[in-house]
């Protein structure tokens, strides 16, 4: 309600904007708006403010109630709330109500574009073998681009943009490089003026929140659930959590599990392999030791009475391997690989004691005369890996020295007669 009657006005500005007389019919208004809107559309290089004014003028004059109030009392009456208020719709929505999208064949248009799919963002996630055995949850803080809430991804205050003059709205530029006589190379690259968007925004019209970038940075914490039995290289996907962009279906954030090496355990599928070294006494007379499992449980490992463990032998324990993924109550096997450590030397008394206990040595079939004819040799200790490396290095050095040697002496020449 007004405290006093509004003043009469003979405002004709909205009619002038559309270029029609005050007695124009609804059909005349439609034709005038369509013609002027296409001409001034930002995607065709038109003035964003002019485009906005055209939409507002048509919105008022096409509504019989608002038009009557405007004709009698002018713009101020609409702003003060007569005729349902002075708020206006998005100028692009009004334009789209006529054409159902872009009348320009989609070239450079910021609306009616076919959406492309954004790229997935892939992160490696380091986990221990213990994590994969027991399962764990990791909280990770990430930064990503999201559509600006102030301009809803348009980049401008008015919602308008202009076709980039540098690339003619294609978002790409072609450069030619001369490689030589009659040879050129043609290369296509994103336009540096519009950053490949095909659009530019007037500096004065840029959104104050995103500065015309259409997106802003957002920090987000994701809870990554690593389930029991997951494998090295397995992917955990968060659909639609990657960087947002206008006219783009948001990609996924993907975490790829990277298992760290374990000092004692090795994993092969659903089985675990454990390395353990026995002394010679343990291998011959029996052993007993405690194995700490990946979940902290203590397992007592012992040999059977009278059992002899040979070097490089394997023993298996059922249901102590890795949990099977998505079937956590089922597990593989644990294999224990035994290495036997021998003493460096024995004194004569120890040798006699062992000979009395152990099976007899094989007897030699050679006679004393045949033994006298044999040549004696001397054995010495060697680290075979270091020995092979030394020989390889020596061979490489000799080859290098040969390459550095100067050409041989003067060639033999035939004496001239």
Curated annotation (Swiss-Prot):
InterPro entries: DnaJ, DnaJ_C, DnaJ_domain, DnaJ_domain_CS, DNJA1/2-like, HSP40/DnaJ_pept-bd, HSP_DnaJ_Cys-rich_dom, HSP_DnaJ_Cys-rich_dom_sf. SUPFAM superfamilies: Chaperone J-domain, DnaJ/Hsp40 cysteine-rich domain, HSP40/DnaJ peptide-binding domain. Residues 384-417 are annotated as: Disordered. One of its GO terms (biological process) is response to heat. It comes from the Eukaryota. One of its GO terms (cellular component) is membrane. The keyword Zinc-finger applies. A zinc finger (CR-type) spans 135-219. Keywords: Chaperone, Lipoprotein, Membrane, Metal-binding, Methylation, Prenylation, Repeat, Stress response, Zinc, Zinc-finger. Residues 415-417 form a propeptide. PANTHER family: DNAJ-LIKE-2, ISOFORM A-RELATED (PTHR43888). This is DnaJ protein homolog ANJ1. The lineage of its organism: Eukaryota, Viridiplantae, Streptophyta, Embryophyta, Tracheophyta.
